[in-house]
């Protein structure tokens, strides 16, 4: 199994900053926006975007934590550990995840969201888009486009969970 670091800590920080600026530019009214991180690493990325928005715009946005496991079609998990600090009805939700691949996690996230309320709008921010979609899902905000083969894997590490920030590509061959 070969692993290669393709994004270091500084480049990852810049990608998150770029996503933050795009969110500011595309959302005229940020006070209706709720950031919703998809567990696990998407939550930490959403918090970092929240921190940058606070630094740049002096605006504190709510951050929710969305558990997609109970809504996935490829596993059976009963317990839902979703935590949403506000009612999402009518809100502009920005889902945040680390990697966009087939789109199945995002479909499950949307299913969970609509079980909680009726958002006004839902958009998607991902740190890495690696292609190979199986569902018609597209990210609105992308930190890095990293094309891969189907056998390769993208591994995003965040300091809060893994002790370091970096993105690697792993080839099991």
Swiss-Prot record:
Protein's UniProt keywords contain Transcription: yes
Alphabetic keyword roster: Glycosyltransferase, RNA-binding, Transcription, Transcription regulation, Transcription termination, Transferase
Motif PRPP-binding: where in chain: 93-105
GO biological process: DNA-templated transcription termination
EC number: 2.4.2.9
Disulfide bonds, paired cysteine numbers: none
Keyword check for Membrane: no
Protein origin, superkingdom: Bacteria
CDD domains per UniProt: PRTases_typeI
Catalytic function, reaction form: UMP + diphosphate = 5-phospho-alpha-D-ribose 1-diphosphate + uracil
Pfam families: Pribosyltran
GO function term, MF aspect, one: RNA binding
Top EC class for this record: transferase
Coiled coil ranges: none
Family statement: Belongs to the purine/pyrimidine phosphoribosyltransferase family. PyrR subfamily.
Oligomeric form and interacting partners: Homodimer and homohexamer; in equilibrium.
Physiological role: Regulates transcriptional attenuation of the pyrimidine nucleotide (pyr) operon by binding in a uridine-dependent manner to specific sites on pyr mRNA. This disrupts an antiterminator hairpin in the RNA and favors formation of a downstream transcription terminator, leading to a reduced expression of downstream genes. Also displays a weak uracil phosphoribosyltransferase activity which is not physiologically significant.
UniProt protein name: Bifunctional protein PyrR
Species this chain originates from: Streptococcus equi subsp. equi (strain 4047)
Gene (name only): pyrR
């Amino acid at each position: 199994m070969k692993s290669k670091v393709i994004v270091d800590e500084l480049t990852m920080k810049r990608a998150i900053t770029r996503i933050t600026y795009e969110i500011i530019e595309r959302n005229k009214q940020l006070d209706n926006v709720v950031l919703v991180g998809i567990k696990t690493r998407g939550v930490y990325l959403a918090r970092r975007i929240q921190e940058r928005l606070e630094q740049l715009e002096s605006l504190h946005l709510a951050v929710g934590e969305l558990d997609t496991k109970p809504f996935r079609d490829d596993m059976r998990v009963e317990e839902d550990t979703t935590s949403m600090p506000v009612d999402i009805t009518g809100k502009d939700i920005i889902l945040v995840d680390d990697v966009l691949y087939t789109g199945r996690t995002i479909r499950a996230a949307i299913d969970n969201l609509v079980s909680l309320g009726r958002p006004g709008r839902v958009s998607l921010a991902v740190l890495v888009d690696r292609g190979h979609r199986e569902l018609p899902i597209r990210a609105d905000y992308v930190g890095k486009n990293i094309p891969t083969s189907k056998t390769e894997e993208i591994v995003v590490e965040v300091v809060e969970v893994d002790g370091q920030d970096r993105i690697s590509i792993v080839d099991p061959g």
